[in-house]
Amino acid sequence: MHPPAIALPDLLLALDGTPVTQPSQWAARRSEVHQLAVPLAYGPWPAVSNRTTCEMLHAATVRRFDDARLWTCRVLGDGIHRFLLRVFAPAGTASHAAVLNGDGCWHYATDTVIADMLRRGYAFAQFNRVEIAPDTPGARLPVGALAAWAWGYHRAVDALGQIDLVDPARIAVVGHSRGGKAALLAGATDERIALTSANNSGAGGAGCFRVSGPGAETLADVTQAFPHWFGPGLAAYAGREHALPFDQHFLKALVAPRALLTTEALDDLWANPVGSWRTHDAAHAVYDLLGAGDRIAITYRPGGHDHAPADWSTLLDYCDVVFRGRSAQAFLHRNRLTP
């Protein structure tokens, strides 16, 4: 199925009508893109912490993971918000590229997934985003939950920079479903994140508000069911998505030229795999402008809504491209399914 031919706002046309044709113009246009998309979609941003502390609570060797190192830390950001961060790293003293996941409230990162990550030479860090903001409709939050969860990713990146197990220049963030929305927002708003990956993230994530495939969650659906995720103004565009000054390709473009991977499932219609293709295609123009066309990828697998082992494996394959210089073309050639 091919995405409907509905026009999306032009990423390469500045607000004053000037075409953006040179890489040197992108910084100014990027600022516009951020202001058009992030405050409206996700609401006010949490206060930026001047100092994040990472207090180690426990260090251990994990036999079932071939003597991998495990650190359990308490992360304290802005002096108020605190959450636990667990970091696994392969045995030895080296620092490693790391995959950071905020879905500790779920159990998609099984022992098998973690063992494979460690075997392939990557560290794995995880926190529970609902320690930062509850995922409860009707909750009175000072900011939208997605913004709070993205803030949690940022504070976890702060903490990983204080841990010898991790190379802070090689951090990938990943999340699934609503966690994928948070991971994409985190990567779009923190240039320290080297690779951003959103899995089955749908409306408000890698999907598209204007372009919806059959059975896809709409802007009305998501803002009615989960108003606490978003900024207070977004719901007003339900049924009039054409009037939005942005769509989710804006969020993807904010990641450029850093690496971006979208992973989708062909049968996960609610997550709008058709719309995800459209926002990927539109954001690609910015990556091409910046000479980073091989740093944006989208893959589809058979099956439904899940952070499946195949999705984790695909992420590690792309980590090999970004962090170890493996062939991007070979990666894309192996992942040629389309919606």
Regions found by a protein language model. Name each.
Residues 94-162, 202-205, 209-211:
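Cap/lid segment of the alpha/beta-hydrolase catalytic domain
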Residues 124-128, 197, 261-262:
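Short hydrophobic alpha-helical runs that function as membrane-insertion/retention elements
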Residues 175-185:
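Glycine-rich nucleophile elbow surrounding the catalytic serine of serine-hydrolase chemistry
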Residues 138-143, 218-242:
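Surface-exposed acidic, glycine/proline-enriched linker/cap segments
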Residues 184-232:
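Hydrolase active-site cap/lid region
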Residues 1-84, 89-94, 109, 191, ...:
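Alpha/beta-hydrolase-fold serine-hydrolase catalytic core, especially in secreted/extracellular enzymes
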Residues 174, 199-200, 263:
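Alpha/beta-hydrolase-fold catalytic nucleophile elbow
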Residues 166-177:
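Alpha/beta-hydrolase fold nucleophile elbow
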